[in-house]
């Protein structure tokens, strides 16, 4: 419903999940099956680029397929995947950003298109869910470590293409946030319980979260073991 009033941001989430659902609404109307299909399309795109990434790294189609099957065993790629939401929306862009980042890292001659696409998909991923920034920070720190500390790679100004594209695509959303008193960020911070004064809760809830994450990864660990 909120996708019908497209904007550069919303009270709870950045705009991309609303944008994609609105596109499907314009094509298929309010048929439930269309949104289940949309969700599975996003999951399949994620699997496809995980397969391509694994094949780049391993050079073996069989092992690359096994990589996808292992990913499929993770709770967030199976049981929760029928419902299209911000978590599903970001999945293909995780795979795409990692895939193009790997291509940039391994290429002897860095291609403009790889840097450009990495920036585009990074922006779309971030505009799907803010927590996408964790992946971007991790990749950025890794490149900084490899280039400036380990000196395995030489700095190339083409790296900045990715950053420039990312920032340019975020500008409309940043303007929207400013004009709306950063309501989306405020909502996210409230959900973290940052105002909670009970110190025990700040210890208890992370432990509970960790236990749950270990639980949902049990099938994945089991398949690796066998």
Show which residues each predicted segment covers.
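Extracytoplasmic catalytic/substrate-binding loops of multi-pass membrane glycan-assembly enzymes
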Residues: 1, 8-21, 29-34, 181
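Hydrophobic alpha-helical transmembrane segments
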Residues: 19, 37, 64-69, 115-116, ...
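Short helix- or helix-capping micro-motifs
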Residues: 67-72, 122, 126
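Short acidic/glycine- and proline-prone juxtamembrane loop motifs at membrane-interface regions
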Residues: 79-90
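Transmembrane-lumen/periplasm boundary regions of multi-pass, lipid-linked membrane glycan transferases
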Residues: 124, 135-226
């Amino acid at each position: 419903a909120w996708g019908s009033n497209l904007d550069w941001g919303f009270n709870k989430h950045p705009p991309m999940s609303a944008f994609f659902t609105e596109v499907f609404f314009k094509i298929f109307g309010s048929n439930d099956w269309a949104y289940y299909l949309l969700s599975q399309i996003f999951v399949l795109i994620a699997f496809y680029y995980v397969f391509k990434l694994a094949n780049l790294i391993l050079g073996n189609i069989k092992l690359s397929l096994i990589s996808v099957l292992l990913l499929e065993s993770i709770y967030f790629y199976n049981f929760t995947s029928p419902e299209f939401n911000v978590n599903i929306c970001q999945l293909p862009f995780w795979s795409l950003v990692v895939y193009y980042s790997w291509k940039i890292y391994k290429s002897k001659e860095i291609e403009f298109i790889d840097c450009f696409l990495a920036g585009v998909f990074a922006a779309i991923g971030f505009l799907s869910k803010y927590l996408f920034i964790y992946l971007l920070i991790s990749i950025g720190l890794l490149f900084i470590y490899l280039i400036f500390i380990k000196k395995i790679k030489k700095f190339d100004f083409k790296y900045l293409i990715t950053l420039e594209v990312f920032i340019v695509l975020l500008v409309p959303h940043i303007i929207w946030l400013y004009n709306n008193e950063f309501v989306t960020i405020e909502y996210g911070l409230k959900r973290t319980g940052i105002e909670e004064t009970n110190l025990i809760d700040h210890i208890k809830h992370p432990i509970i979260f960790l236990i749950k994450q270990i639980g949902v990864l049990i099938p994945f660990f089991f398949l690796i073991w066998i």
